[in-house]
């Protein structure tokens, strides 16, 4: 028997229909799973917390869930009680009430464990981490192994061969002595890919204040191979968040009992919920340069 082949346009329509139906079924299944995940996040908030509801249209609603029904939830917000379909909610995040300032939600500082280059006394929590890139040529990554131990590292990306690249490791141990007082010890270890010798610094550091306004002081000793410097390097820095997305940062170094010029820096930190960009200038006291050397870094939190 001879079968008449389906015309090209008809085949295209049939294929398009199958694809559309398949995508619709996949989307429906994903939507159903997402709705089930959201339901597990729904609960009535206490007076010490607010809830940030991210809706599927990209908008954000901030308030407290006061009632949960089968298909809707009631949210107490700054404009009164609102009835919100559960199917329209993509995510619910519970935050402390003090994160609201002048009617805006201030997300937590995503880069509270560092100033520009120097570490603060704060630690990454277990499983948290970040990917960073300093001055374009120095990418790296750091992860919280536990709430009190983190490990980081990276490798240079100079426009040269592999044998001419540097690697670095940044182990760190620390914790909170009390609220708003955090201390840590750690090291920066630098080596060459083709060179077995290492240089670096071991340090102790303390941070005093909140993640949005803090002072950090540290002391470190440089080393080369197994030889440790007898003269420490002192660091004093701080961070002040001046708006929801902007902070001011400074990081300064001095070598006591030497003629070395102190190094000071100042700059801004641009913040998103998961990413920061630092733009700064570093200068040496007495160098005669009024502006300083530019410094830029990018940090993405995960």
Task: For every predicted segment, state its role.
Residues 32-133, 137:
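Compositionally biased alpha-helical segments
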Residues 15-26:
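Bacterial N-terminal signal peptides
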Residues 7-17:
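Bacterial N-terminal signal peptides that target proteins for export
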